[in-house]
Amino acid sequence: MKESDKLQILKPTASAIFDIARELGMIKEIYNELSECSKLFQDIDIKKYFFDKSISKKDKKELIDKRLKPILSKETYAFVSILTEHDSIDVLPDIVALYKEIADDYSNIVRVRIITASTIDDKTVEDIIQTVKCFSSNEISYETIVDENIIGGIIVYIGSVVYDYSIKKQIDLLQSKFTYGN
């Protein structure tokens, strides 16, 4: 399944969960629970267990009941149970990411991710954030990431928009021109 098709299917699910959380006044709590569950199900041993066809759905459900039901809200527990019953727990990270986007939109928050090859000073980060503020009246939440693989330059994610001014991107473009003649 293509990523765009997958997101088109999962977005209504994330929206429905968000709507329930909003109605209950539990937006942050349900996000935190879903996020923790998502991390839990990324564990290799847990993943193997839940995708093992020789283990019955009943046994998987009992494990969820025993371990997660006591620590999750009934809404999050019900959702995780449904995903487990339908062997769809692997989509939880995607749903959590979509939920976060919906929650950010609802709360008027713009997420900015700044990726550089080496650590940048606070003044540079502040200049980038001030530039973003010129285009958005929303609250800005940002993170900086060092990724030596980009070689140099900068990549800035503003919401779902990517501005890639990395050396790696320039090299990839040159390689593409030489390879395909575009």
Swiss-Prot record:
Pfam families: OSCP. Coiled coil: none annotated. InterPro entries: ATP_synth_OSCP/delta_N_sf, ATPase_OSCP/dsu. One of its GO terms (cellular component) is proton-transporting ATP synthase complex. It is a peripheral membrane protein. One of its GO terms (molecular function) is proton-transporting ATP synthase activity, rotational mechanism. Keywords: ATP synthesis, Cell inner membrane, Cell membrane, CF(1), Hydrogen ion transport, Ion transport, Membrane, Transport. Its main location: membrane. It comes from the Bacteria. It is found in: Cell inner membrane. Belongs to the ATPase delta chain family. F-type ATPases have 2 components, F(1) - the catalytic core - and F(0) - the membrane proton channel. F(1) has five subunits: alpha(3), beta(3), gamma(1), delta(1), epsilon(1). F(0) has three main subunits: a(1), b(2) and c(10-14). The alpha and beta chains form an alternating ring which encloses part of the gamma chain. F(1) is attached to F(0) by a central stalk formed by the gamma and epsilon chains, while a peripheral stalk is formed by the delta and b chains. F(1)F(0) ATP synthase produces ATP from ADP in the presence of a proton or sodium gradient. F-type ATPases consist of two structural domains, F(1) containing the extramembraneous catalytic core and F(0) containing the membrane proton channel, linked together by a central stalk and a peripheral stalk. During catalysis, ATP synthesis in the catalytic domain of F(1) is coupled via a rotary mechanism of the central stalk subunits to proton translocation. This protein is part of the stalk that links CF(0) to CF(1). It either transmits conformational changes from CF(0) to CF(1) or is implicated in proton conduction. This is ATP synthase subunit delta 1. It comes from Brachyspira hyodysenteriae (strain ATCC 49526 / WA1). The lineage of its organism: Bacteria, Pseudomonadati, Spirochaetota, Spirochaetia, Brachyspirales. The gene is atpH1.
